[in-house]
Amino acid sequence: MQGTVYKSTGSWYQVKAEDGKFYECRIKGKFRIQGIKSTNPVAVGDEVSFDLEEGVEEKTGVIKKIKERENYIIRKSVNLSKQTHIIASNIDQVFLLITLNNPPTLTTFIDRFLVTAEAYDITAVLLFNKVDTYSIEELAEVKYLAELYRSAGYECIGISAKNGKNVDKVKDKMIGNTSMISGHSGTGKSTLINAIEPALDLKTSEISRQHSQGQHTTTFAEMFDLSFNARIIDTPGIKGFGVVDMDREEIGDYFPEFFERKQDCKFHNCLHIEEPKCAIKDSLEEGEIAWSRYKSYLQIMEGEEDNYRVDQYQK
């Protein structure tokens, strides 16, 4: 039988078969995909072949094969930094929810996420949530960040998942697509999904006052069919985002504003760090490229882990 993985709980996978029915499936033994060393060999969004288990009253299956993925979002695993975790696969676009506070989303985190989306050719849209709660100063900061990322080529939308502001814009972008929603815990992922499709009635989190972080309400990634010809993947809140398996020479290509200028560098293999006559560094000095983006680039190049607790908005 053929189907698509809608939910993964680590050991069991909920698969929607071509007949529209859901089956609880598992994998037997060491199930590894060539070229990918991840903590989860099967991910939400995977298209799989599975066999129903004989002699079992409840309809359970065993996954035999995974169809080649069109793309996936991957990051370093939480517990084992050398291992990776595939968040979801076969995605048309990803929405990254960003909040200025409660919890803060830093540019280092945003940039690492965007680099991964670029590397796997997934369209990313930045959603600045909770705009209804911000002061004039905070709204100015949102405007600054939105302009920064728009100048790098990304679509940015200010929303309020709670009062519905611009939720229709997000919904329109989802029609006909499989979309993934990501961000820190407490940025409003489940609230946004409920605003888009109230019938789902997902559990939402309260913010921990002590740490300004959201409490995890989504433990495992899960995909939902929506009533307007769309699918959405809800993902667990993530703290840091480790970039996986990229050569130093290619990292700059995943910053769109670097890529479009690199042909003007003196050296074709310019890494935009110490080389003379570098178009990226010239653009940086001229204010055409944001310092925060360049700092993120240097951190990724140096292999530094994302420190989401340190304020790095400033130069």
Swiss-Prot record:
UniProt cofactor(s): Zn(2+)
Cofactor note: Binds 1 zinc ion per subunit.
Highest taxon of source: Bacteria
Domain CP-type G: 80-241
EC number: 3.6.1.-
Coiled coil: none
Similarity remark: Belongs to the TRAFAC class YlqF/YawG GTPase family. RsgA subfamily.
Annotated function: One of several proteins that assist in the late maturation steps of the functional core of the 30S ribosomal subunit. Helps release RbfA from mature subunits. May play a role in the assembly of ribosomal proteins into the subunit. Circularly permuted GTPase that catalyzes slow GTP hydrolysis, GTPase activity is stimulated by the 30S ribosomal subunit.
PANTHER family for this protein: SMALL RIBOSOMAL SUBUNIT BIOGENESIS GTPASE RSGA, SMALL RIBOSOMAL SUBUNIT BIOGENESIS GTPASE RSGA 1, MITOCHONDRIAL-RELATED
Protein name: Small ribosomal subunit biogenesis GTPase RsgA
Gene label: rsgA
